[in-house]
Swiss-Prot record:
Equilibrates slowly between two distinct conformers. These two conformational states are clearly interconvertible. It is found in: Secreted. GO terms for molecular function: toxin activity. This is Conotoxin r7a. The presence of a 'disulfide through disulfide knot' structurally defines this protein as a knottin. Belongs to the conotoxin O2 superfamily. The lineage of its organism: Eukaryota, Metazoa, Spiralia, Lophotrochozoa, Mollusca. The keyword Disulfide bond applies. Residues 1-5 form a propeptide. It comes from the Eukaryota. Induces a sleep-like state in mice. Expressed by the venom duct. The modification 6'-bromotryptophan is found at W6, W15, W38.
Length: 38
């Protein structure tokens, strides 16, 4: 199931997985190149 996190004023929904194959990843977690890792 997708995880929900808040980034600024946006509620982001993304799957835990590599950002390059997951375009629903929040931009904040994509900085670490792996969704869900902040």
């Amino acid at each position: 199931a997708p995880a929900k996190r808040w980034f600024g004023h946006e509620e982001c929904t993304y799957w835990l997985g590599p950002c390059e194959v997951d375009d629903t990843c929040c931009s904040a977690s994509c900085e670490s190149k792996f969704c869900g890792l902040w």
